[in-house]
Design a protein with these regions (language model features):
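Glycine-rich dinucleotide-binding loop and its adjacent helix/turn
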Residues: 1-28, 32-34
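FAD-site-proximal beta/loop scaffold in flavoenzymes
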Residues: 2-15, 104-150, 162
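Cofactor-binding loop segments of dinucleotide-utilizing enzymes, especially the Rossmann-like FAD-
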Residues: 10, 26, 48-50, 145
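Short secondary-structure boundary/capping segments
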Residues: 12-15, 35, 58, 91, ...
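A conserved FAD-binding loop/helix module that cradles the flavin
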Residues: 31-33, 143-175
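Gly/Ala-rich phosphate-binding loop of Rossmann-like dinucleotide-binding domains
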Residues: 38
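A Rossmann-like FAD-binding core segment of flavoenzymes
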Residues: 41-127, 172-175
Length: 175
């Protein structure tokens, strides 16, 4: 992700200080970031022509202190220590210490080719697993970003440990 564009407020929100945090909407999922990030600093939600907030959503954002900017983003200009500049199509420029995005997940076709059951998450399709990381296909286990919408190294390592344990048990005991 680099040093100034992020996907997870829990992983990176605290690193940015108190000023100039941006959320670039790619879908309505940006509301999640727009409501969460004010805990870490002054936040602007750039609607980016991706969705139109409802009156209720606008009230929620206002209550959290999130500023809203309309219009489409044109480009992101990288800077050094300071952060980035988000340049809008109409020429407005917003200096930011960091920018959050909520991209959709795109799975490899392998799980579907194996016949694994998939499920829709807020960020895209993931492989459905149980607590032991087993998929709907006996002997096939999934972990990390393929089986969890929240992209996190910590979760991936924990899920991987469980999938490894479960795979070994499956090979030994047929369960």
């Amino acid at each position: 992700w680099g040093k100034r564009v992020f996907h997870c407020p829990y992983c990176h929100g605290y690193e940015l200080g108190k000023e100039g945090i941006g959320v670039l909407a790619t879908s309505e999922l940006a509301m999640h970031h727009g409501l969460m990030l004010p805990d870490w600093g002054a936040t602007t939600l750039f609607v980016n022509d991706a969705f139109e907030p409802t009156a209720e959503q606008l009230a929620q954002l206002k209550a959290r202190g999130t500023h809203i900017e309309y219009g489409a983003a044109a480009r992101l200009v990288s800077q050094t220590e300071v952060g980035v500049e988000l340049v809008m199509q109409d020429g407005r420029v917003f200096p930011l210490v960091g920018l959050f995005v909520a991209p959709r997940i795109h799975l490899s076709p392998l799980a579907a080719q194996l016949g694994c059951e998939l499920e829709e998450s807020p960020m895209g399709c993931i492989v459905k697993t149980d607590a032991m990381q087993a998929t709907s296909i006996p002997g096939v286990f999934a972990c990390g970003d393929v089986a969890r919408a929240a992209g996190s190294v910590t979760f991936a390592v924990a899920d991987g440990a469980m999938a490894g344990l479960s795979t070994h048990r499956s090979l030994m005991f047929g369960c």
